[in-house]
Amino acid sequence: MPPRLRPTHLEYVVDGVKLRSQLSAAALEHAGDELAQRRAALEILKNALFRGRMIAKERLENGAGGIETARLLSGVTDEVVSALYDFTTVHVFRARNPTEGERLALMAVGGYGRGTLAPFSDIDLLFVRPYKQTAHAESVIEYMLYALWDLGFKVGHASRTIDECLKLSREDFTIRTSILEARRLTGDEKLAGELVERFRKEVVKGTGAEFVAAKLKERDERHARAGASRYMVEPNVKEGKGGLRDLNTLFWIAQYLHPGESLEKVMHLEIFDRREVRTFIQALDFLWAVRCHLHFATGRPEERLSFDLQPEIARRMGYGDRGDAPAVERFMRRYFLFAKDVGSLTRVFAAKLEADRVKTAPKGISRFIPGRAQKRKPLDEPGFHEVGGRLGVDPEIFEADPVNLLKLFRIADQRNLDLHPDAFTAASRASGLITSAVRRDRHAAKVFLDILARGRDPQRTLALMNEAGVLGRFVPEFGRIVAQMQFNMYHSYTVDEHTLRAVGVIADIAAGRLAEDHPLAVQTMPLIADREALFLAMLLHDTGKGGAGGQELAGARAARQACERLGLERSKIELVAWLVEHHLVMSDYAQKRDVSDPRTVADFARIVQSPERLRLLLVLTVADIRAVGPGVWNGWKGQLMRELYTATEAVFRGGRGSDAAAALKRYQENAAYDARVSLAKADPLAEPWADAMEDAYFTAFSEAEVLAHARLAQQAGGGAAAEGRIRSELNAAEVVVAAADRPRLFVDLAEAITAAGANVMGARVFTSRAGQALDVFYVQDASGQPFGSHDPRALARLAETLACAARGEPVAREPRKPQDLGRTAAFAITPAVMLDNEASETSTVVEASGRDRPGLLAALARTISDAGLSILSAHIDGYGERAVDAFYVVDADGRKLTDARKRNALKSALLAALTKAEAETAQARRTNLQRARASVAR
C-alpha cells in the first residue's frame, strides 16, 4: 500500500485570491465584449478545476486518504463555484444599489453540502432569495448555471425563498435531508444563516421520530433496489448495502437529533465505543477512496465496482499478489470486511433507533441509546428476557459464561425473535470472549449444533452470528472465508454468504419448500440418517478455498479440525470430511461425463460407496449449486443429476459385491426392454428402429419422448428431419435431429446452431446400429432464455436449418451482434485441455476449458473432426466466463485415441483454438484497465 501523504492546504491547490484576480483581469481586458469575457472566464475556471482534480488524483494515487480527497475535491469546487458567483455578480450583472429583494445566498446542499465530493459527482446548489424572484437574481442564476454546465458539471439546482424551503422540507424528506446539510458557499451571509436557524426551529424540532422512520424506510428500499445482500460480488459503493449511503444515513440521523455537529463530534456522542468509532472512520475513508478511484479510472460518475474495474482499482490502491491470493481478491476481501463492519455499525445505531419508537420530541441522541425503561418479560433462561417483542440480554452474562453468546442466538431462533439492538451490540462487543477453551466446550458445541442442524431458520440465525462476529470466532475455519470473494463471474456472493445461503437451501429442502424445483432432493431428505453431518459439511464445504493442496483437500483438513474440536465421534468426523472433499464430484460426473456410459456410473459409485453417501451428496450438491447465484441452477442440471443418481442407486441395489458396470448394464437392459415393449404396442412400425438403438438411450428419455423420436426417425428415412419444442422446465428449447450418420455431422449441426444465433447448453448424441444418428440439442438465446420462447417461428426455422445441415446443404448465417465483452474482458483465462482414456471403456474423453463465447462448441468440434475423430457425445458446462466442454471421441476405426503423437497434436490444436480466442479478447478490449487471472475455484 502507498504511504499516507500529509494533508495539503487548499490554497496550495487553488488560490482563491489569485483566481479572482485572474477573472477580474480577464473582465477588464475584454470589457464591452460579453462573449469574450465569458470565454476567458471559463478558460480560467476550467484550468483551475482541472489542476485541482489532477492534484487530488495524484495525491490519491500516492496514498492520500479517501475522505481527504473528497474534501479536497469539494474545496476545489467551492473555489470555482464561488469565484464564478463573484465574477457574475461583480462583472456581468452587478447590482450597483441592490435592493432588499435582490439579496441572494448561494448554498451547497446534499452530499456537496457535507463538504465531500467524488471527482464526477453531481453538485446540488440552492439559491436562496428573500422574496419572489427578481430579474437580477434570475439573470445571475441563469448565467451561472450555463457556465457550470459548460465547465462539465452536472448541476442539481433550485431557487427558493426561505419559506418555500421550509414548506417543501416539511413535505419531502429528500428535500429535508438536503437542507439538513446545507452549507453557505457565498452570497448573503444573513440570508443563509436565517435559513439554517429557521430550519432547525421550525422543521427539525420535535420531528426526530418521523425523520428516523423515514430514513430507515428509505434505507430498506434502497437496499432492495441495489441488491439485498452486502456481499454481492459487484457492489455499488455508493448505494449498496454496506456502502457510503449507509454511513451517511447514520450521520443524517445523528445530525438531525443533534444539530450543528461535525462528523467527528457526532461519532463521539456515546453511540459507539472507541473501536467502533475507529472502524466508522476507517470504513468511510476506504469507501471514499474506492469511489474516487472509480470516478478517476472511468472518467464518469461510476458507482458500481464491477468485475472489469476491480483489478484496476486494486492496482491503484496498492494491492499486489501475495502467495496464492491475487491482488484483486485481497482488495475485494478488504472491501467486504468494511461492508460487514458498516452492517454492524448500522445495526448498532439504526436498529436501536427503529426499536425505540417515541412520540415526543427527542432532546438529543441520548433518547436513543441504552438505558430507557421498557417492560421486560423474563425468560426461563437466566439473564435473557423479551423486551418490545425482541430478545434482550443482561450483558454481564457473557463475561460470566461466554457460552451464553451462542445461547443468545439459539433462543432467538427457537422463539422466532429478532435481537434487541442492545443485545446485538453486547454480543458483537463480547465476541472476543470466545477463546480456544470455549470452542472446545461440549455444551457450546451442542448449542451451536442445535442452531445449525436443528434450528428453525439456520440461515438467518447464522447470518446474525456472522454479522456479530460470533460465528467466525467460534468456527475459525469459517472465519477465514468471511468476506472472501473469487474473481470470476460464476459466483454472485462472497464465500461466507454463499455458504450460509446453501445452508438455508438445505433447510428449505428439509421443510419441503422446494419440492417443485428439487423433487428428488426433497424426496431423498427424509431418508438421510445423519442430517447433522450434512449441515456441518455444508457449513465447511468451502473452507479450503485458498488453502494448500487444493480446495477439496484443504477443505477436508479444515473440516476434520473443526469437527474434532466440536467433540464429534470419529465416524461422523470422517463422513463430514469426505463430503467436503467430494462436494464437487457429483456435479462433475453429471455435467462433464456421459451418464449413460457404464464406466461413468461405475467410477462414481466406487467413489460414493454407499446409498447414504449418495443421498447426502445429492442434497449437498443441489444446495451448493443453487446458492451460487440467480439462474445458476436450471432444469437441465437437475435432469442430469437425477439420471446419475438413479443409475448409481441401481448399482447399489445390485448389492455390495456386484460389479458396478455390470449392475448398470442390467439396469439399462431392463429399462430398454420395457421401453421397446411399450413402443411396439404404440407403434409397431417403430420396432426395428428401437431394436437398433443402444440400451443406454432408453434410460435418458421418457416413453413419450422415445415414441416421438421413433416417428421423427421414420419421417427422416434415409435423409434428415428435425423438430423443436420449448422445454420450460429445463429453461431451454429442445431440438431433435434424426439423420443418416456421417463424418462431421455433429460439427455441421453445431455450426448451424451458432449460425442461427443460438447457444448450446446441452447435447445428447446417439447412433443406432442401423447407421442413423439421433442428436438432441438443448439451446438458449443470447439472453439465456429458451430459444424461440418469444418467437415460435424462430424455433421452427432452427429445426429446418438443422435438417438442411444434416443433409449437407449450405446454411445461411443469421446476423449476430458483435459480442459485447463488457465485464468478461477483465478476466484473463488460461485455456486447458485434458485427454483421458480411463474415463470410458470405449472412448477417449477430451475435456477443453476456456473463455465462453458464441460458437465455442462448434469451433472445438470442428478441431476434433479435423483430427480425423468422430464425436460420440458432447457435454457442455459453464462457470461464468469459463466454459468446460467434454467430448467422447473415437478414431476412424472406432477405437480410443492411443497414439501419443496424435494425442499431442489434438491437444495442441485445441489449445491453439482456445488461446486464439483469448488473445482476440485481450486485443478487442476497449480500455487499458488492468486485467486479472480468473479464479477457477468453484
From Swiss-Prot:
Taxonomic placement: Bacteria, Pseudomonadati, Pseudomonadota, Alphaproteobacteria, Caulobacterales
Cofactor(s) annotated in UniProt: Mg(2+)
Protein name, entry field: Bifunctional uridylyltransferase/uridylyl-removing enzyme
Domain ACT, chain residue ranges per copy: 734-813, 845-924
Entry remark concerning the domains of this protein: Has four distinct domains: an N-terminal nucleotidyltransferase (NT) domain responsible for UTase activity, a central HD domain that encodes UR activity, and two C-terminal ACT domains that seem to have a role in glutamine sensing.
EC number: 2.7.7.59, 3.1.4.-
GO annotation terms (biological process): regulation of nitrogen utilization
Activity regulation, short description: Uridylyltransferase (UTase) activity is inhibited by glutamine, while glutamine activates uridylyl-removing (UR) activity.
Hydrolase among keywords: yes
Region of interest: Uridylyl-removing: 380-733
Gene3D superfamilies listed in its UniProt record: 3.30.70.260, Beta Polymerase, domain 2, cca-adding enzyme, domain 2, Nucleotidyltransferases domain 2
Described purpose of this protein according to its UniProt entry: Modifies, by uridylylation and deuridylylation, the PII regulatory proteins (GlnB and homologs), in response to the nitrogen status of the cell that GlnD senses through the glutamine level. Under low glutamine levels, catalyzes the conversion of the PII proteins and UTP to PII-UMP and PPi, while under higher glutamine levels, GlnD hydrolyzes PII-UMP to PII and UMP (deuridylylation). Thus, controls uridylylation state and activity of the PII proteins, and plays an important role in the regulation of nitrogen assimilation and metabolism.
Recorded catalytic activity of this chain's protein: [protein-PII]-L-tyrosine + UTP = [protein-PII]-uridylyl-L-tyrosine + diphosphate; [protein-PII]-uridylyl-L-tyrosine + H2O = [protein-PII]-L-tyrosine + UMP + H(+)
Gene that specifies this protein: glnD
Domain HD: 495-617
SUPFAM superfamilies xref list: ACT-like, Nucleotidyltransferase, Nucleotidyltransferase substrate binding subunit/domain, Poly A polymerase C-terminal region-like
Record keywords, A-Z: Hydrolase, Magnesium, Multifunctional enzyme, Nucleotidyltransferase, Repeat, Transferase
Membrane-spanning intervals of the chain: none
Domain of life of the source: Bacteria
